[in-house]
């Protein structure tokens, strides 16, 4: 009877301990203990309490364990960096060789290379972006310089066109004046020749006077003779 009471007290004590600490270390995260094998798991004792948030807590615990496993020593990091610089891709044989050499799990080596490639690509993109920005700035500066030079040349061309137009106008006016001058000289010469011929004809308009030695002068008028 005394042994039966002692077993009952031990049973209830373990039950309370399981209920108080089930949120820290769920039974599904550990192998079954001798107590759970003898008395049953905490989920069998109190299913509602044991299953509450058990999956989340178990996942958190396993993530902490994985994080601890991923923590690498400086020597391991240096060797992994050297291997990454040699070859960015991780082949299966190389993964197993590195894991054995560094004392790591192959999955740890694979995850490290995956993260390292992601960081490498990010830095490469940043470098390419900076290079493109620098190239754009240089092209923009060159374009601004060429634009100013183009405007200057355009102004010079416009000025030369204006001067050429003025020169053409002057030449046209000179040719026109020369042409008009030649026409005026020709008309004057024709008029002079016509006047001389007309005077000779008028000299003999009155032959009876010509016999007496008088000749017709068309320039004579009554006012000239004061008649």
Curated annotation (Swiss-Prot):
Signal peptide: none
PROSITE patterns: HOMEOBOX_1, HOMEOBOX_2
Keyword terms of this UniProt record: DNA-binding, Homeobox, Nucleus, Transcription, Transcription regulation
Family to which the UniProt record says this protein belongs: Belongs to the HD-ZIP homeobox family. Class I subfamily.
Start and end residues of each stretch annotated as Disordered: 175-198
A Pfam family annotated for this UniProt entry: Homeodomain
Compartments (UniProt record): Nucleus
Role description: Probable transcription factor.
GO molecular function: DNA-binding transcription factor activity, RNA polymerase II-specific; sequence-specific DNA binding
Domain of life: Eukaryota
Keyword set includes DNA-binding: yes
Annotated CDD domains: homeodomain (cd00086)
Name of this chain's protein: Homeobox-leucine zipper protein ATHB-54
Region (Leucine-zipper), start-end ranges: 125-153
């Amino acid at each position: 009877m005394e042994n039966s009471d002692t077993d009952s007290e031990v049973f209830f004590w373990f039950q309370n301990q399981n209920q108080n600490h089930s949120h820290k270390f769920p039974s599904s995260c550990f192998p079954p203990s001798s107590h759970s094998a003898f008395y049953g798991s905490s989920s069998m004792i109190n299913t509602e309490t044991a299953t509450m948030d058990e999956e989340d807590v178990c996942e958190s615990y396993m993530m902490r364990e994985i994080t601890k496993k991923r923590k690498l020593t400086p020597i391991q990091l240096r060797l992994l960096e050297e291997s990454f610089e040699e070859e960015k891709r991780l082949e299966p044989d190389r993964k197993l060789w590195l894991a054995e050499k560094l004392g790591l799990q192959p999955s740890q080596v694979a995850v490290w290379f995956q993260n390292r490639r992601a960081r490498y690509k990010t830095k490469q993109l940043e470098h390419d972006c900076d290079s493109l920005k620098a190239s754009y700035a240089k092209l923009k500066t060159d374009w601004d310089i060429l634009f100013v030079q183009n405007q200057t040349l355009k102004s010079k061309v416009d000025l030369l066109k204006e001067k050429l137009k003025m020169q053409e106008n002057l030449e046209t006016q000179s040719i026109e004046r020369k042409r008009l001058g030649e026409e005026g000289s020709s008309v004057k010469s024709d008029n002079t020749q016509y006047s001389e011929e007309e005077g000779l004809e008028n000299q003999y308009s009155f032959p009876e006077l010509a016999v007496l030695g008088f000749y017709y002068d068309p320039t004579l008028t009554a006012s000239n003779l004061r008649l």
